[in-house]
Regions:
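N-terminal cap/lid segment of alpha/beta-hydrolase-fold proteins
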Residues: 20-49
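Short substrate-entry loop that stabilizes the transition state in hydrolases
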Residues: 50-52, 60-97, 186-187, 218-219
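Alpha/beta-hydrolase
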Residues: 58, 88-90, 180, 242
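Alpha/beta-hydrolase active-site loop
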Residues: 103-143
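Short glycine-enriched nucleophile-adjacent loop
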Residues: 139, 159-171
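Alpha/beta-hydrolase fold nucleophile elbow
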Residues: 144-156
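The feature captures the conserved acid-bearing segment of alpha/beta-hydrolase catalytic domains
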Residues: 176-238
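C-terminal catalytic histidine-bearing segment of alpha/beta-hydrolase fold enzymes
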Residues: 234-277
């Protein structure tokens, strides 16, 4: 009987802690339209009415980004610093309608003709970007979002999306971009995405801080895009590979996910604060 009481007490304590975290970040699940598809996103904001500067967070290629700690962990970085966060989930991910990009690419890859490489670029430039920008448009309607102080960030496929969105800063309203490990998993086998992201360096006019962990799948995105920025005199486009001072599990792609976000948290908050001055 005593053991059952302890278990019940522990369960209540855990539920209370989870409820406190959700309340602290004012987490809300929302839906929005991208064309004829209904997509899902998560919004967070500090206590109070705002409006707050807002981080648009782009997830990677994982099937269920809404089912893990990713978005809450992003909120834990930015909400205490005074930011709202909006994380749209692109088509086919989690509860969002539509086809899943990885399934589409796998079908093309199975043909063995290299068409998956050009398709990767095409889907990022069209469907994936359309979904992200639909999410941004929705976020701008939220009363706690300051549409004049928008920044964008994301990892892996989300890093690609961050760079593509940054190209449209003038029309969308982004003030800075933080791509993390953009295309690192596909870089070595996809020259098409290499060239497309080099083109982004030329197109982007807002501050960019591209970061990677020391053990990423490829460090070429930081090296190549940083060199291209230096070559054309884009001083606002900076890259940084972190020193291997973190645990091994956080030295890998996207800093190992949510558990490694603390590694770049301080740099990200400072970067955005400087860009929004």
């Amino acid at each position: 009987m005593r053991m059952n009481t302890v278990r019940v007490t522990l369960a209540i304590a855990l539920l209370t802690a989870a409820a406190h975290q959700t309340a602290r970040f004012n987490k809300t699940r929302v839906t929005f339209k991208s064309g004829n598809l209904t997509l899902v996103g998560y919004a967070y904001h500090p206590d109070g009415n705002g409006p707050f500067p807002t981080v648009i967070w782009n997830h990677g290629s994982e099937k269920n980004p809404g089912g893990g700690p990713q978005f809450d962990s992003v909120a834990a970085v930015f909400v205490p610093a005074g930011y709202a966060v909006f994380a749209p989930m692109r088509r086919g991910h989690s509860d969002s309608e539509g086809g899943y990009i990885v399934d589409t690419l796998n079908v093309a890859r199975a043909r063995g003709d290299g068409s998956d490489r050009t398709l990767l670029v095409k889907l990022h430039e069209t469907q994936q970007l359309d979904d992200q920008l639909a999410g941004v448009a929705y976020a701008k309607t939220l009363p706690f979002v300051d549409a004049r102080r928008l920044v964008v960030a994301g990892c892996s496929f989300g890093g690609i999306q961050t760079l593509l969105a940054a190209e449209r800063a003038r029309s969308v309203g982004f003030r800075a971009a933080l791509p993390i490990s953009p295309a690192a998993l596909t870089w070595s086998r996809t020259p098409e995405i290499q060239e497309r992201l080099k083109r982004s360096v030329h197109e982007i006019t807002i501050p960019v801080l591209l970061i990677q962990p020391p053990g990423d799948a490829s460090l070429e995105p930081a090296r190549v895009l940083g060199a291209e920025a230096a070559r054309i005199g884009k001083k606002q486009f900076r890259t940084m590979v972190y020193a291997p001072t973190m645990p091994d599990s956080q030295r890998v792609h996207c800093f190992g996910g949510a558990k490694g976000f603390h590694t770049w948290a301080k740099d990200a908050v400072q970067f955005f604060a400087d860009a929004l001055k």
